[in-house]
A protein has these predicted regions:
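Glycine-rich flavin
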Residues: 2-5, 22-29, 34-169, 197, ...
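Glycine-rich dinucleotide-binding loop and its adjacent helix/turn
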Residues: 48, 140-195, 199, 223, ...
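Beta1/beta-strand and adjacent pyrophosphate-binding region of the FAD-binding site
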Residues: 2-14, 169-176
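FAD-site-proximal beta/loop scaffold in flavoenzymes
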Residues: 153-169, 251-326, 413-415, 428
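Flexible, glycine-rich terminal cap/loop adjacent to redox cofactors
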Residues: 9-37, 49, 53-60, 342-353, ...
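Short, acidic, Ser/Thr-enriched surface-loop or helix-capping motifs
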Residues: 113, 287-288, 391-393
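Short glycine/serine/threonine-rich phosphate/pyrophosphate-binding segments
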Residues: 16-20, 42, 157, 182-185, ...
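Short hydrophobic core segments
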Residues: 9-11, 116, 131-141, 175-176, ...
C-alpha cells in the first residue's frame, strides 16, 4: 500500500464532506478526500436534487390541470415519463461539475475513490492507500432504512436511491412510510398519472405541527392519493411488477413498492471499532464541537444520527473547520435549524413548536396569520395555508411553523430572527412590498400588539388626546 500523510482526511464526499474539503484546502491545509460512491453524495444523486426536479415536473402537470379556474382551458396533459426522468437526469448532470473530482483536485484536494476503513485510531485504509492524518472527519451520510418486513427482501422494492432510475410510469405505487420523502413522492407520482397508496404506521409527518400537517393530508387525499395511517405492514410478496403488500387493514396489490421508512447512518464498513470510536444504534456519538470520544476524529451530518438535512451537514462542516483549522471551540447550536417538506402546499418549520413553547413558557403567545388573508395568495389561487409564530412572554421570537405556498422561502426571515435572538418588534418595523406572500410575516408579527393597540385603555388615551387643541 502507498502511504499518505496529511493534515485532514475527510471520509465521504456528500455536502458536508465536500464543504470541509473545499474550505480546508483553500485555507491552506493538506486534505485527502475519500469517496466510494458518487461525488456529491445522496443529496445530489438520490435525494434533494432529483426529488425536487421530479416535483417540478409534477407541479407543471398540476398547474395545467388547475388552469381552468383562471379561465384557461386545456386538455389533460400528456406525460412522457421517460422525458420527465431525463429532466431529472439533466438537472443532476448540470450540478455535478460543482461537486466533481476534477473540481476538487483543482482546489488541491487529493481525491481517492475507494471504500475507507480505520485500521487504527490515526490510520485509514482506502483501496491501494494507507492514509495517516492529524484529524479525520467522518461524513458518510445515511441510507434508506429497510424495515424487517417478511418477504420484502425477496421483491424488487425501491428506495430513494433507485426510484429515480424507474423510467416507465408505475401503474400503482405503494409507499411504505409517511414522512417527507414518502409524502413528496406520493404527490409527485400521483400528479404524473400513477395510482398511489401511502401507508404509515403512525401519523404522517410526525415531527411537524399536527394542525399544519392536516392541510397537507387533505390536499393529498383531494388529489386522489389513498392515505392510510395507523396501518402496519405485515408482509410483501410477488415478483416483477405484480406485488402485494399485506397490511393490518387487508392486502393491497400494486406494481411498485417504495420504502421510505426512515434512514440509518452509514457506519457499518468504517472499522470504527479499530479506531475506538463510540456509536449508538449505528450513529457516531459526538460532543457539541462534533468531536467523537477520540478527539482527533470528528463526525458531521447524517452519520451522527441527528437532524438529517443537507443544510445541517453544511453547517456542521463550518463548525468543524473552525475547530480544526483555527482551534476555535466552536459549538453546534440547533435552536434555529429549519426544515421544509416540499409537498404542495409546502410545510416549513424553525425553532420551537407550539407544544414546545407551551412546555417552556406557559405565558408564551402563538401568533397566527392565514394565507387566505394574503392578497398575493388570493390572486394566485393559493389561499390555503397558515403561519404560526411562537413568542415567549418577553416578546422574543422562539419558533415559526408554516404551511402554504412557497413556505420554504417565506419562512426564511424567521430563521434569521431566531438565530439572532430578535424581539417580535423587529418583524413589524420593516416595509413589506405589496402584494407579496411575505406580507404574512409582518401580519403575524403585528398581531402581537393588537390586544394593546385596540384595548379600552388605548381608546381612552386617544379620546383624551383628541380633546387637546
Amino acid at each position: 500500500m502507498e502511504a499518505i500523510k496529511t493534515d485532514i482526511c475527510v471520509i465521504g464526499a456528500g455536502s458536508g464532506g465536500l464543504s470541509v474539503a473545499a474550505g480546508a484546502s483553500q485555507m491552506g491545509a493538506d486534505v485527502v478526500l475519500i469517496e466510494q460512491g458518487e461525488m456529491g453524495g445522496d443529496c445530489l444523486n438520490y435525494g434533494c436534487v432529483p426529488s425536487k426536479a421530479l416535483l417540478a415536473a409534477a407541479e407543471s402537470v398540476q398547474a395545467a390541470r388547475d388552469a381552468g379556474r383562471f379561465g384557461v382551458h386545456m386538455a389533460e396533459p400528456v406525460i412522457d415519463f421517460g422525458q420527465v426522468h431525463q429532466h431529472v437526469r439533466d438537472v443532476i448532470d448540470g450540478i455535478a461539475p460543482h461537486d466533481s473530482q476534477e473540481r476538487f483536485e483543482g482546489l488541491g484536494v487529493n481525491v481517492i475513490r475507494a471504500s475507507a476503513s480505520f485500521t487504527e485510531p490515526k490510520t485509514v485504509a482506502a483501496g491501494d492507500y494507507e492514509i495517516t492524518a492529524k484529524r479525520f472527519v467522518v461524513a458518510t451520510g445515511s441510507s434508506a432504512a429497510v424495515p424487517p418486513i417478511p418477504g420484502l427482501a425477496e421483491v424488487p422494492f425501491l428506495t430513494n436511491e433507485t426510484i429515480f432510475s424507474v423510467h416507465e410510469k408505475p401503474e400503482h405505487l405503494i409507499i411504505i412510510g409517511g414522512g417527507p420523502i414518502g409524502c413528496e413522492m406520493a404527490q409527485a407520482h400521483r400528479r404524473l398519472g400513477c395510482k398511489v397508496t401511502l401507508l404509515e404506521l403512525f401519523t404522517m409527518m410526525p415531527k411537524d405541527d399536527p394542525e399544519l400537517v392536516d392541510v397537507v393530508r387533505q390536499r393529498l387525499i383531494a388529489e386522489g392519493i389513498d392515505v392510510r395511517e395507523g396501518i402496519g405492514v405485515e408482509a410483501v410478496e410477488g415478483q416483477g411488477t405484480a406485488l402485494r403488500v399485506v397490511t393490518s387493514d387487508g392486502a393491497i396489490d400494486g406494481s411498485h413498492v417504495l420504502v421510505a421508512a426512515g434512514r440509518k447512518p452509514n457506519t457499518e464498513s468504517l472499522g470504527l471499532a479499530a479506531a475506538g470510536v463510540e456509536t449508538e444504534r449505528g450513529a457516531i456519538q459526538v460532543d457539541a464541537r462534533l468531536r467523537t470520544n477520540k478527539k482527533h476524529i470528528f463526525a458531521i451530518g447524517d452519520v451522527t444520527g441527528g437532524y438529517q438535512f443537507t443544510h445541517q451537514a453544511g453547517y456542521h462542516a463550518g463548525v468543524v473547520v473552525r475547530n480544526i483549522l483555527f482551534r476555535v471551540p466552536a459549538k453546534v447550536d440547533d435552536s434555529s435549524i429549519p426544515w421544509v417538506s416540499y409537498t404542495e402546499p409546502e410545510l416549513a418549520h424553525v425553532g420551537l413548536s407550539e407544544e414546545q413553547l407551551m412546555q417552556q413558557d406557559a405565558k408564551g403567545t402563538v401568533l397566527r396569520s392565514d394565507f387566505a388573508g394574503n392578497d398575493r395568495a388570493r390572486a394566485t389561487g393559493q389561499g390555503e395555508g397558515l403561519l404560526k409564530v411562537m413568542v415567549d412572554r418577553k416578546g422574543k421570537i422562539r419558533g415559526a411553523s408554516m404551511v402554504g405556498p412557497h413556505a420554504g422561502e417565506v419562512i426564511q426571515p424567521w430563521i434569521l430572527a431566531i438565530s439572532q435572538g430578535l424581539h417580535i418588534r423587529a418583524m413589524t418595523g420593516y416595509r413589506a412590498p405589496y402584494p407579496t406572500l411575505g406580507e404574512i410575516n409582518k401580519a403575524a408579527a403585528s398581531s402581537f400588539y393588537t390586544p394593546t393597540l385596540y384595548s379600552s385603555r388605548t381608546q381612552r388615551l386617544v379620546r383624551w388626546l383628541m380633546k387637546l387643541p
